[in-house]
From Swiss-Prot:
Catalytic activity: acetyl-CoA + phosphate = acetyl phosphate + CoA
Protein name (database record): Phosphate acetyltransferase
The species this protein was found in: Haemophilus influenzae (strain ATCC 51907 / DSM 11121 / KW20 / Rd)
A GO molecular-function annotation: phosphate acetyltransferase activity
Family statement: In the N-terminal section; belongs to the CobB/CobQ family. In the C-terminal section; belongs to the phosphate acetyltransferase and butyryltransferase family.
Annotated keywords: Acyltransferase, Cytoplasm, Transferase
GO cellular component assignments: cytoplasm
Recorded domain comment: The N-terminal region seems to be important for proper quaternary structure. The C-terminal region contains the substrate-binding site.
């Protein structure tokens, strides 16, 4: 029996879309199958078009959603006194969602001046769907006590404490910036420095609702990073022409109007700042070029007045702007007109801003009461599935519990520093950055991040000598001398490996700059393979829309023998199990069963036999073609008696060419997130990054490494 939760906003401006996304993410992290519906579309423009939440969920997830009724259709039926007809149609849509989902999250209508009927319709929808009600509120000009009173007044419209289906309230956006009248600003003005902030502690809010009949289910503090828009969004809003595209998706975290003399403005030339200046201010352009050349990621430059950049200044600055990928755009209006236009910019998250959507999901989900979420999923009649959000959540939780220390040899690389900061903030691991502390601090400031607790910076020059004797001892048989050892320890990967060998750290992650060979070679020479392992292999975790699959080996072994392939299969199955995936191993080939022949097929057959013999406890079958392994209808015709075909979770490829090609084809064609490669078979955990790795990729690789260190 599925459950239905309806989120009902107490007023406008409560951040309803964000709360919907966060709640859904919290439920998915528990492995619950969730669906979403907005019974009546209510876009902020008032037009008849799809609402923002449904659009976001359809473009960023694979969740089942209902088609909402357009506002004009709903209003027409309400106006003709046919609310019952509208409700019947809503119930029909809802019933379709309950068939295959554990929980249906419903988003209610927002009460506005134009939609004064919203609360009565929300109540009728909640009744019709037998939905449990969660109110969503945000402080406006009230004190905490006044907010509580307003929530309780709103709750009374839905039966208050006498309604067992009224679960409680989510308080969002507390301590948001307000203008002089005390109003929360829903536009770009929120990121100007001129607005005041309330200073209410979360403890105050919790204490206040502790004495209320309405339970506090989540208390979400204001987070300015969640409204950091992209340069391209401002370009579209202003109708600006692009002079230098650069990283047009770069985040804008503040605005500086360059109307003063340069000495009075230069402190605002910082990461994420949008500099608004007349194009006839060459001093601003030159200063911005200098800042960019020093690694400061300015958010962008907006030139006003319609002037063209002076040719000599353009010639001087353009190479720096292009190298720094600094977005520069121009509009015809003057600075005053531009300021007015920026004030009208709506900061609702764009449907295509996947990074911001993901950040909102993660942030909001962290603030839900754990007991509330656990109680929602406790009655689920289906077996939990390991969805991608559930897998990522599990990685984070396991890494937190592990409390490991991970060394990052590329300690002053910008993405690595950002990842280390995130790991520290989330408690994923203590990161050790190997780099000159001054260099790390300089890069961190340029990136706009703060290095806090949970990060250790070690200057390689200060500690290299500590490992010379041990390296000579370990590699003496290979002719290692003190001079050669000192030279090798200049390589921070070698230095990090020696720290790992000495048990000073628990794992190593590298590869954002180094090649795979440079990352793996020192650990192979110094750490060596684990007992019982003859080779090192790798796997990728492929995060499909509704499940997580394991692909191996896609990164290390070019052409493994049958014995090695069997070992890769066993390693991959054990890794899958360690990370919560039930291993059903498919040995992939170009033929299924006995339908083909040749050396490659025979190798897979033999590898399957060896793996089954060594580990009879594992479900392993092969050779299987990829479609037979993954698709149930194909499996029924090609391998009807296979215990794995059609439901494989671990895919073992016969060689690196096949594995790497398949991994990249599936990842790119389906626009999937993958985590890895994760190395298997090492005595201590070492993991390689792609040189194109994103910050999140590095974070999850650090988490994987921390978890491996416990095994």
């Amino acid at each position: 029996m599925s459950r239905t939760i309806i989120l009902i906003p107490v007023s406008t401006g409560v951040g309803l879309t964000s709360i919907s996304l966060g709640l859904i993410h919290s439920l998915e992290q528990k492995g619950t199958k969730v669906a979403f519906m907005k019974p009546v579309s209510q876009p902020s423009t008032g037009e008849d078009k799809l609402d923002r939440t449904t659009s976001i969920i359809r473009t960023s997830t694979s969740l089942e959603t209902a088609e909402p009724f357009m506002l004009s259709v709903a209003e027409s039926l309400i106006g003709q006194n046919q609310s019952d007809v509208l409700l019947e149609k809503i119930v029909a849509n809802h019933q379709q969602l309950t068939k295959n989902n554990d929980i249906v999250v419903v988003e209610g209508l927002i009460p506005t001046r134009k939609h004064g009927y919203a609360n009565s319709i929300n109540y009728e929808i909640a009744q019709a769907l037998d939905a449990e009600i969660v109110l969503v509120a945000a402080p406006a000009t009230e004190t905490p006590t006044e907010l509580k009173d307003r929530v309780e007044a709103a709750a009374s419209l839905f039966g208050g404490k006498n309604n067992p289906n009224l679960l409680g309230v989510v308080v969002n956006k507390f301590n948001a910036p307000v203008d002089e009248s005390g109003r929360t600003r829903p536009d770009l003005a929120e990121i100007f420095d001129s607005f005041q902030h309330n200073h209410i502690s979360e403890t105050e809010v919790n204490k206040l609702f502790a004495g209320s009949a309405i339970k506090l289910l989540a208390c979400v503090p204001w987070n300015a990073n969640l409204i950091a828009t992209r340069a391209i969004d401002l370009v579209k809003h202003l109708g600006a022409s692009i002079i230098n595209e650069g990283e047009i998706n770069r985040r804008i975290r503040g605005i500086t109007f360059c109307a003063r003399s340069l000495p009075n403005m230069v402190e605002h030339f910082r990461a994420g700042s949008l500099l608004v200046a007349s194009a006839d201010r060459p001093d601003v352009l030159v200063a911005a070029a200098l800042a960019a050349s020093n690694g400061i990621e300015i958010g962008g430059i907006l030139l006003t007045g319609g002037y063209k950049i002076d040719a000599q200044i353009n010639k001087l600055c353009r190479p720096t702007f292009e190298k720094a990928k600094l977005p520069i755009f121009r509009i015809e209006g003057n600075t005053w007109q531009t300021a007015l236009s920026l004030q009208s910019f709506n900061l609702e998250v764009p449907v295509d801003d996947k990074e911001r959507i993901e950040n909102i999901k993660q942030y909001i989900s962290q603030h839900f009461n754990a007991d509330f979420i656990n109680n929602l999923v406790a009655d689920s009649s289906r077996l939990p599935r390991l969805s991608p959000p559930a897998f990522r959540f599990q990685l984070t939780e396991l890494a937190r519990a592990a409390k490991k220390r991970i060394v990052l040899p590329e300690g002053d690389e910008p993405r690595t520093i950002k990842a280390a900061v995130l790991c520290a903030e989330r408690g994923i691991a203590e990161c050790v950055l190997l780099a000159d502390p001054a260099s790390v601090q300089r890069v961190a400031e340029a990136q706009g991040v703060k290095l806090g607790k949970g990060i250790t910076i070690i200057n390689p020059a200060d500690v290299r000598e500590n490992y010379v004797d041990r390296l000579v001892e370990l590699r003496k048989a290979k002719g290692m001398t003190e001079t050669a050892a000192r030279e090798q320890l200049e390589d921070t990967v070698v230095l990090g490996t020696m720290m790992l060998e000495a048990n000073e750290v628990d794992g190593l992650v590298s590869g954002a700059v180094h090649t795979t060979a440079n990352t793996i070679r020192p650990p192979m020479q110094i750490i060596k393979t684990a007992p019982g392992s003859s080779i090192v292999s790798s796997i990728f975790f492929m995060l499909l829309p509704d499940q997580v699959l394991v692909y191996g080996d896609c990164a290390v072994n070019p052409d493994p023998t049958a014995e090695q392939l069997a070992e890769i299969a066993i390693q991959s199955a054990d890794s899958a199990k360690a990370f919560g995936i039930d291993p059903k191993v498919a040995m992939i080939s170009y033929s299924t069963g006995t339908s083909g022949s040749g050396a490659d097929v025979e190798k897979v057959k033999e590898a399957t036999r060896i793996a089954k013999e060594k580990r009879p406890d594992l479900l392993i079958d092969g050779p299987l073609q990829y479609d037979a392994a993954v698709m149930e209808d194909v499996a029924r015709s090609k391998a009807p008696n296979s215990p794995v075909a059609g439901k494989a979770t671990v895919f073992v490829f016969p060689d690196l060419n096949t594995g790497n090609t398949t991994y990249k084809a599936v990842q790119r064609s389906a626009d999937l997130v993958s985590i890895g490669p994760m190395l298997q078979g090492m005595r201590k955990p070492v993991n390689d990054l792609s040189r194109g790795a994103l910050v999140d990729d590095i974070v999850y690789t650090i988490a994987l490494t921390a978890i491996q260190a416990t095994q």
